[in-house]
Structures are given as C-alpha cells and as structure tokens.
Amino acid sequence: MAMSDRLLKAWYEGHPALALLRPLESLYRRVVQRKRTRFLAGEGEIYQSPVPVVVVGNITVGGTGKTPLILWLIEHCRRSGLRVGVVSRGYGAKPPQLPWRVEASHSADLAGDEPLLIVQRCGVPLMIDPDRSRAVKALLASETLDLILSDDGLQHYRLARDLELVLIDAARGLGNRRCLPAGPLREPVERLQSVDALLYNGAASDREDGFAFRLQPAALVNLQTGERQPVDHFAPGQQVHAVAGIGNPQRFFNTLETLHWQPISHAFADHAPYSAEVLNFTPSLPLVMTEKDAVKCRAFAQPDWWYLAVDALPSPAFVAWFDTQLMRLLPARLLP
C-alpha cells in the first residue's frame, strides 16, 4: 500500500501515529486561518469579478463528486439561457502559457484531465490557471458571460466569490475531523459554518445541514468509437477490469458492483498518467474506467475499453434553493 493510501486509511479509520503530526497540523491551521482572516478583512489583492462567481469545492482531500456536479450546474444554467464559463487550477496540466484556454482537441497533458472532461462533455469556455483571478480575467476578456463556476478554489481567497458550494462524501464524512497532515481537512471544520450550501454525495435524503445528491450511471461509452450503450450492456456477473485514478476509487468500484458486475479493481493515484503497458491486464476482459481517466487513454484505447458516464442528481430542494440564489445574483432580464 502506497504511503498516500496508508495516510488516507489512517485519517478515516484512525491510527495512533497520527498524534505525531499534530504539531504540523497546528502550524497548518494557523497559516490557513491567517489567509481567511485577511480575506474577510479585505486585505491583500482580492479580485471581484463583474459577473457572479460560484465556487464548487471541497474541505477534504480526495474525491467528492465535484466534476459531475459542475457538469450538472453548467447544463442547468444553460437551460435558463445563461452563458456560463469555468475556471480551474488545471492540476497536472502543462500548457505553454498561463492562463490557458482548454479546447476539446487538447490532450490531457496539456489541459489537465478534469478541465478536458468538462470541455469535451459540455463545450463550455474554460480557462486554467493556478491563479483563479487571472483565469477569470482572461475568460471575461474573450467571452461574454453571465456566470462563472470555479472548479475547486474554495481556499483560493484572491478570488472573491458570490456563492460557495461544498461537497462532502456522505459515506466517509470528514474522517477524524482534523486538518492536514493529521487529518483530511484543508480548513478547520468550523469553515463549513460560513459556506452557502453543503451537498452530501450519496446521502439518501436531505439533511438538516445540507442537501443530498447522488451519481447515477448513465451509459457505457466506448473509448475507441464513442459508441454509447446502456449500463446493462454487460450481463450480470460479467467480470471486468475496473480502472480508477480518482480521489476515492472505491466509490467507483462499488458502483460497478451495484450494476451486478464483478470488477477486478485497479486503483491508481488521483490524476495518474496511463499507458497501454500499464493497463495491459490479464486475463483478457472488458475494461471499464471513469470518464476522468478516459480522457487520458483514448490515444491507445483497445476495442473493449469503456468508460462509465455518470450524471449528478441533486435533490429537488437543492435545485429550488439554487434557482433562488440565481434570481438573487443575476439581473431579472437574464432569467426566464
């Protein structure tokens, strides 16, 4: 088990050795709290966008279903006639310059896997830059937009925001509720009291402190041809090689089991690079991966390689709440 996997296991299941990391946790907490205090006091260079900015982020390390929810937000806003843009850090991207506009024809090496997925799925204007403020400025210089979604960036306080949505894995929760490196939290748990909405991925119903949403398998898509098949394409009991290089790969493997397949699990690090050799598994079986992994594998995909497309389904209460926020943030003329 890799060191990162052992640490993740300790955060969520407990380990006495984590006590040794508490002095570093105290230092980390002071740094992040100082950043937030400066932001609240209006100190430093903080960019206020002329159009509303909605941050979709995490307070924990690891995957929470953020990208599918962003895809849902894009399409929901578009159905209301809104022009939406996205900014992202572009983790792992190696563009020739920053900021960099992501196009559907780019490689994942150039664009980053999550930004490329978003552009290929939605065709939305998307700019990557670790400096989210600079990304927003570049996006607005090239596009007329009504709303900007910030992919992650909850802790990027140089960009002012109008709405903060924080996602939490309903099954794993906040682990031991301690900050890095003694726990999985990027900011102290008290930070959740100041965000606009919490969304619990996998919750059966809305909670007193937040909304439920779930990820629903939508289709199997062939990497080579783009052919779409229903999720019952494989017979119950079918063995498949399951590949996931995401923040919480076990959630993906569990999803395949709910479809009554028998996945042979191959977990990789989040944003891991792939090659044909790395994915040359035995025995020879169909291979199913996440859509995020697929954008890195199309160039060398084999005929029986598929990705599972998933759609975010937020609760009706969240949809109504979000529409109310849009009415508050946007001029009435922009909304139907």
Swiss-Prot record:
GO CC aspect terms: plasma membrane
Highest taxon, organism lineage: Bacteria
Swiss-Prot/TrEMBL keywords: ATP-binding, Kinase, Lipid A biosynthesis, Lipid biosynthesis, Lipid metabolism, Nucleotide-binding, Transferase
Enzyme class: transferase
MF (Gene Ontology): ATP binding; tetraacyldisaccharide 4'-kinase activity
Binding site for ATP: T60, V61, G62, G63, T64, G65, K66, T67
Known EC number: 2.7.1.130
Family annotation (InterPro entries): LpxK, P-loop_NTPase
Pathway entry: Glycolipid biosynthesis; lipid IV(A) biosynthesis; lipid IV(A) from (3R)-3-hydroxytetradecanoyl-[acyl-carrier-protein] and UDP-N-acetyl-alpha-D-glucosamine: step 6/6
Catalytic activity: a lipid A disaccharide + ATP = a lipid IVA + ADP + H(+)
Electron transport is among the record's keywords: no
Pfam families xrefs: LpxK
GO biological process: lipid A biosynthetic process; lipopolysaccharide core region biosynthetic process
Known role: Transfers the gamma-phosphate of ATP to the 4'-position of a tetraacyldisaccharide 1-phosphate intermediate (termed DS-1-P) to form tetraacyldisaccharide 1,4'-bis-phosphate (lipid IVA).
Family indicated by similarity: Belongs to the LpxK family.
NCBIfam families documented for this protein: lpxK
The name this protein goes by in its record: Tetraacyldisaccharide 4'-kinase
